[in-house]
Amino acid sequence: MNPDNTIAVITETIPIGMQFDKVYLTTFNMWREILSNTIKTLDISSFYWSLSDEVGTNFGTVILNEIVQLPKRGVRVRVAVNKSNKPLKDVERLQMAGVEVRYIDITNILGGVLHTKFWISDNTHIYLGSANMDWRSLTQVKELGIAIFNNRNLAADLTQIFEVYWYLGVNNLPYNWKNFYPSYYNTDHPLSINVSGVPHSVFIASAPQQLCTMERTNDLTALLSCIGNASKFVYVSVMNFIPIIYSKAGKILFWPYIEDELRRSAIDRQVSVKLLISCWQRSSFIMRNFLRSIAMLKSKNIDIEVKLFIVPDADPPIPYSRVNHAKYMVTDKTAYIGTSNWTGNYFTDICGASINITPDDGLGLRQQLEDIFIRDWNSKYSYELYDTSPTKRCRLLKNMKQCTNDIYCDEIQPEKELPEYSLE
């Protein structure tokens, strides 16, 4: 495969009703493009399946129907999905259509879940991003991902991660991965590709460390390296930012690695840091305190800012939707697109992956991701940490209707904390 033929495209889902001056190719259209061009094989790693539409458009149903038709065209389809305690009707339909399915019990193996979301088509084309196999991810949840076409080398490397999941569907965790599914590329030896005539260095990282086979870069290592190598700025857009590990016993442990690297970059190297964190009705109150702590560092010589991103509600409201679910970072050098929230457990016992791309000219895909971040940061959907919100969508901001003229709306009385794992 000639690496000069590689095509890479940023994709996103903009929830119905939100308005931006510039948007990129939709997740729905990209998935359809991949499905229509799949000839021999399709591998999908997924958290759960809920494509059968419940409200509004039939986008999810369209995708599900097209996947169901693939075996009839002679396409071998494999689906690795997190083992659930309740039946997944969509998955049962896939199995009836001839799709090979393995339920991956990461809870039993590591105590976490299979949270990775990616596709591999014909061992040549890939998609990786925040979107779940859920109709909401096509119309009601803000998502971001990347599709890369015509690169067998990168597809083969991502397939090695899929094979790890596929193996765990019927086997226990091996003593070590020395003889299993080695990585072809990593942070020290990235793959060189040309996208639109521009050379890019790219590699795929995986989490947690226990599932990183020989030569595979751990996702946390890739993330910290991305921050540490920045010279001018680090822009982050994630659903959750909580430097905590939640234990099975109900205890919490401080997990400072990402936060420390961000603080160090802003203070020691005067790198501009911007955090755009999602806020909705299920946001954790403890996250607000950590974000305020970071934001308080801003001063004459420390450029660090935090905003909350609120997706307006639907009418009528739709459960588990209307939130910015993206998980990416962009610096002046590198684009990082992942599948994990920035909470400790997502790097210690939950399965995730990321694509790390560095263009030689500093532009290309990295520039596109920067443009998306700045668009969202400056939009009417972004709020300061001490703002009041015109909607009840954000659990961490005071609603305007709750404020009086003589009381500054600052403190919020915390409600009972919600479970850490919900939509995410």
UniProtKB/Swiss-Prot annotation:
Domain of life: Viruses
Principal cellular location given in the protein's record: virion
Classification via PROSITE patterns: PLD (PS50035)
Matching InterPro entries: Diverse_PLD-related, PLDc_3, PLipase_D/transphosphatidylase
Swiss-Prot/TrEMBL induction comment: Expressed in the intermediate phase of the viral replicative cycle.
GO molecular function: endonuclease activity
Keywords from the named record: Endonuclease, Hydrolase, Nuclease, Repeat, Viral envelope protein, Virion
Database matches in Pfam families: PLDc, PLDc_3
GO cellular component, one term: viral envelope
SUPFAM superfamilies: Phospholipase D/nuclease
Entry's localization field: Virion
Disulphide bonds in the chain: none
Coiled coil feature spans: none
Similarity comment: Belongs to the orthopoxvirus OPG042 family.
Function: DNA nicking enzyme that cleaves extruded cruciform DNA at its tip. Probably nicks viral hairpins.
Protein name: Virion nicking-joining enzyme
Organism whose genome encodes this protein: Monkeypox virus
Name of the gene: OPG042
